[in-house]
Curated annotation (Swiss-Prot):
In the N-terminal section; belongs to the complex I 30 kDa subunit family. Pfam families: Complex1_30kDa (PF00329), Complex1_49kDa (PF00346). Residues 223-608 are annotated as: NADH dehydrogenase I subunit D. One of its GO terms (molecular function) is quinone binding. NDH-1 shuttles electrons from NADH, via FMN and iron-sulfur (Fe-S) centers, to quinones in the respiratory chain. The immediate electron acceptor for the enzyme in this species is believed to be ubiquinone. Couples the redox reaction to proton translocation (for every two electrons transferred, four hydrogen ions are translocated across the cytoplasmic membrane), and thus conserves the redox energy in a proton gradient. GO terms for cellular component: NADH dehydrogenase complex; plasma membrane. It comes from the Bacteria. This is NADH-quinone oxidoreductase subunit C/D. Its EC number is 7.1.1.-. The lineage of its organism: Bacteria, Pseudomonadati, Pseudomonadota, Betaproteobacteria, Nitrosomonadales. It is found in: Cell inner membrane.
Amino acid sequence: MSAASSLAPQRYMQDMGGASNASDVLEELKNRFGPPGTDNPGGPMGVVQKTGDDLPTQWVSRNRVHEVLHYLKLKAERPYRMLYDLTAIDERTRVHREDQPASRFTVIYHLLSFERNADVCLKVALTDTDLRMPTITDIWPAANWYEREIWDMFGIVFDGHPHLRRILLPPWWQGHALRKDHPARATEMEPFHLSTEKEEAEQETLRFHPEEWGMRRTHDGTDFMFLNLGPNHPSVHGVFRIVLQLDGEEIIDAVPEIGFHHRGAEKMGERQSWHTYIPYTDRIDYLGGVMNNLPYVLAVEKLAGIEVPDRVKVMRVMMAEFFRIASHLVFYGTFTQDLGALSPVFFMFTDRERVFDVVEAICGGRMHPSWYRIGGVAQDLPNGWDRMVRDFLDYMPARLDEYDKIAVGNRILKARTRGVGGYSIDEAIEWGVTGPNLRACGFEWDFRKARPYSGYDQFEFDVPTGQHGDCYDRCAVRVQEIRQSLRIIDQCLENMPAGAHKADHPLTTPPLKKHTLHDIETLIDHFLGVSWGPVIPPGEAFVGIEATKGNNGYYLISDGNTTAYRVRIRTPSFPHLQMIPLISRGLMISDLIAILGSIDFVMADVDR
């Protein structure tokens, strides 16, 4: 038995609930807090909003939201223990807000209950003149970075926040980028000029002041050392800075600093058409390929009412699992390299090239093929695809057996990773951890099983779990996930349905050619659909999937236009990095290197 396969799965929750439990929470809130009132827009417990995804959405007044959130997490019979996402909307130019209370800015709390297998969204309406909210960092520590992001992007102040400062944009930035009156392109801004004085001032803003973060410079007559790890260091896996407070070689505390890789991915979604935004999704987790396309196109299809053919579902699953393997191979190789083993990364990258050979033959591209489409995929499977897939499936298992010997079975790797950087299931949920990093604690939660999408309920596969939530288990879980992805791909190969690779729907994009062959009007519709993109009906929809690094979700708002009114990207790596201080205190820098490698993140997934 390999070291990876010795992990004993264990279930944390027996009652996973069901979709029928989703609306129960609204009645529960009504019984607990009473019917709608009049003290704020929407009342204490105000309007129940209808959305395109049937996600229970309740408007709550600002002066009651802290109380309601506290109840849902700590006092409800089946609590919502994870703060899945926290974001905001600038509503000032939105036209279609039927059956919603007046709001100039809206704050959205997205909660997840594992006991119910259900989510709930709470919305709070704000006016231009009073953009203030109570912090919820006393309820969820994971809210810290989310609240900082909302202040950074929208200018909404969270009273009581321990350190409300910019997080994605630099300290010297003027304005709040996701407001509708903020420029969306560099051509809409003044030409950039970096004078010597400005350069020096910007550099000074990067100087670390421990007192601002509640850190002491000395203790018992001994000076602490403050060390910059990054933003240019090979072991931080991107442009990422961690300021370490050290007592000798021991880490006393750490301050992660992100934002160096921020590109405005959500803002771009407001100026790209629904179709032309697809390539931008590839660049979020840039190792995940088409996996990034999937939650986006699924959310658009919910808004548009598109049901794709079974063949499309299976093709999407197959290519998503190929990219899961490719991403995990990068993780596997770089993780062992971080720990001092230089050979495995070359073998694993060679096998990743074999994955890309298949991907390129099917999609026409390698790392970022942008192959999924609204209503389908870009083209049908090519001749000979089945032979290429079968050759890979026959080749890969033996390679994984070899990797078990040289990597996860290696005694040096075990010594460096077992018992290092561990956390419990409760801590993982508290901080918003999802994906393999959550399952490494022993919690068998996988969106493909718990909330099947794209036909995943038709596939047989296991959900690998760990026991201790440490660096070793995080690695071992991913190794086993590669084997499970091979099982899924094999089932796709053996059971690929016949049929079309696009839905026969007027909003499928690009539209079907046959729709042009009737009269001049259908030709015009086709031309507009190709050049400007589809007009998606007004509404809101969220879709989350089990991506390579955890749960990746897209929350989309359509205002009845060819572009999105709001694109919110919920990435797994953002909350994962926020945990670094918790799991690194008391360890050595070499342990932190192992922790960073085991988290499996890319900074584009964090900074967007």
